[in-house]
Each structure stands twice: as structure tokens, then as C-alpha cells.
From Swiss-Prot:
Superkingdom of the organism of origin: Eukaryota
Catalytic residue positions: 153, 272
Name the record gives this protein: Ribulose bisphosphate carboxylase large chain
Entry keywords, A to Z: Calvin cycle, Carbon dioxide fixation, Chloroplast, Disulfide bond, Lyase, Magnesium, Metal-binding, Monooxygenase, Oxidoreductase, Photorespiration, Photosynthesis, Plastid
Organism classification: Eukaryota, Viridiplantae, Streptophyta, Embryophyta, Tracheophyta
Keyword Magnesium: yes
Source organism (scientific name): Trichomanes striatum (Fern)
Residue ranges that the Swiss-Prot or TrEMBL entry lists as coiled coil: none
Amino-acid positions noted as binding substrate in the UniProt annotation, renumbered to this chain: 101, 151, 155, 273, 305, 357
Amino acid sequence: NYYTPDYETKGTDILAAFRMTPQPGVPPEEAGAAVAAESSTGTWTTVWTDGLTSLDRYKGRCYDIEPVAGEEHQFIAYVAYPLDLFEEGSVTNLFTSIVGNVFGFKALRALRLGDLRIPPSYSKTFMGPPHGIQVERDKLNKYGRPFLGCTIKPKLGLSAKNYGRAVYECLRGGLDFTKDDENVNSQPFMRWRDRFLFVAEALFKAQSETGEVKGHYLNATAGTCEEMFKRAIFARELGAPIVMHDYLTGGFTANTSLAYYCRDNGLLLHIHRAMHAVIDRQKNHGMHFRVLAKALRMSGGDHFHSGTVVGKLEGERDITLGFVDLLRDDYIDKDRSRGIYFTQDWVSMPGVLPVASGGIHVWHMPALTEIFGDDSVLQFGGGTLGHPWGNAPGAVANRVALVACV
């Protein structure tokens, strides 16, 4: 009774679109019902305590199934979940239910969560991004163009002093931001406190010489939440405008906690998506990146890596622009051509700046500005530091190319 094709969805339901591949001989209706049951109130048998609650009120319902065009034995199962199944303001609880045990089901060869519709009645229980796009522009006093960034390379092995030197040269050359690589936490060759101190010196020197507000994404990701907060607090005490977090490896609970701290203390929050391809790259199993993007917007982040379309990392143009819109816009219409299964209304939740990063350089600038528009961060690592004349000329080249394109 978890397959209910007559069910009319409510405005408060959380809706999910699963791409499922049933085992041979398993009807799609049975597989869809199993997904709805296991991700809500069901278990492998009937239990007597079912009679002590109203399963009809709390159960998930598979309300529609459609075949995947061009694929044999693959189906899109649409499941509606009542709002009361989920703790308010908790991405952790949302994912524990919807993508928990169900992905290991024997009745399924593969299962992928393609999209989620988050109703305003649930999204309003989340703080969302600490500040959002407009507040960030006001803090930095920069308008009418994308922001320019650079990931410091080599990503591992530099001393703190040489790292700070590279930061200074890039910011002095015209970039708005430099960035810790996601791998950089606090290793023997460069402890986090030393890095923070040399970077702060570089930051303020570049600011005083250029008259522009500059930033460096100081990676606060750590092995414990306590250590993460220690690093974020030290960054704030130094006067840094922005910190960074690896939200998948760090975890949603840690990320949401850090986002609250950043809003309360005036820090911007840059989010890296390290580990995402483990979850989202297979087209038949796992979770699509657009779901991870929606989850991040709720959990909290001001910048988020979204792919480039033109760089070294995988990403189709229309699909990428679909989740860029889901990060930035208030209201996004259903559009299956871009992989958007449901209309999404974020109401007043602040937007997130998409970050284009990965194998891009100045020759990509016309395409990047056309694809991403003004509200974005264009981040060049090797595309800055690989300039034959050095780091500062690489930064100058990026800034000149950007000005020419906008």
C-alpha cells in the first residue's frame, strides 16, 4: 500500500524523483513501493506496533512511475513524504531518511536520487547561506562583474611563508580572492596557525596597496568540530573576511554549525565539494549533484563549487546551469531538459554564488562570463600561477581578460 497512483501531492510534501533499476523480475510498482516504504515508515515485515500509530499519516507514497527514455528496465519513481517525517532545520535528518538504507535494497540493482522538491514550509526552518550574494557584494564593495579567485598551487608542500607570498602576489595583481586547496588543513609542512598568520599579512598588504577589499578562503575544516571552530574563531580575530569548509567530508552537521557561526560573526563562508563525485558521478546510482546543491543552500554557504562546463571537470552546460539557478535564484521552474523535476520556491532564502573552478584559464573567460553571468566566482589555479612570467602577471592577465569581457 505504499504505491498509491491516485495520491494528490500536497504543497507541504517533500517530493523526490528516484531513478531506479529493479532486479530482473521485480515489477516497477513493487520496487517503487519498496523505496517509499524503506525511506519512510516501512520495514521488512508487518509489526504489531503499526497499530499504535497512523501509518496513513506518516508513510511515504510512490505516486507515479515513468520509464526512462532510451533505457531498458529503468524507471523514474516519484515519492511524496509528509513533512512531519523530518526534523526542522536538519539536512542530516533529511538525508538519513531519504537516502539511508534504501540504497542497499536487494530488490534494486541501482538507485539514484535525481531531485528533491523542498516546500517553503520546510525550507523556512533553515537559516540557509550566512549572508548571500547581495550582502557579500556590499561587504566587498564590488558590483557589476564576477569575482576572480585563485587556488594556491602546489596544493601541498609549500611553507607558510612561501604560501603567503603567493597569496600576496595574486591579490596584488588584481584578484579578489585566493583559496586554500581543499586538501590543505594542518599538515606537518604547514600548520594551520602559521598559514593563517602569513596569509593575513599578505591580505592586508595587498589591500593597502590596491585600495580594494581582498579575501582568502582560510580552510577551517578539521578532524573535530571543536578544532574547526577554533580555526574559524582565529580567522575572525585576524580580521579575515571569509573562511572555507569541505562540507561533504566535514559533514552536514558541522557545516550548518559553522554557517550559524559565520552569520553571527560577519564571516563569509566558502564551500568546497570534495568527495562529491563519489556520490554523484554514476548516472544510475547515488545522488545527483543538484540534490547536493540544494542541501548545501539549506545547510549554509555563500560560495559553492558548481563545475565549469569548459574546464577539466565533467559537466554538461544545460544541467550545470540548472543547478547554478537552483543555487542563486528564488524561484526555479520545472524543466526536464535541464534535469529539474520539480518547481522549487526558495521564498526569501539568500542565494549562493556558484564557483567555476577546475582547469580554466584566460582563454575561457569569454565563455565563462557568458555562461555564469555577473553573480559568480571564476577561480583560476594553474590558470593564474602557470603564467610564464609569474604569479602577479598571471593575476593581471585574469583581471584584464575579465574587464574586457564584461
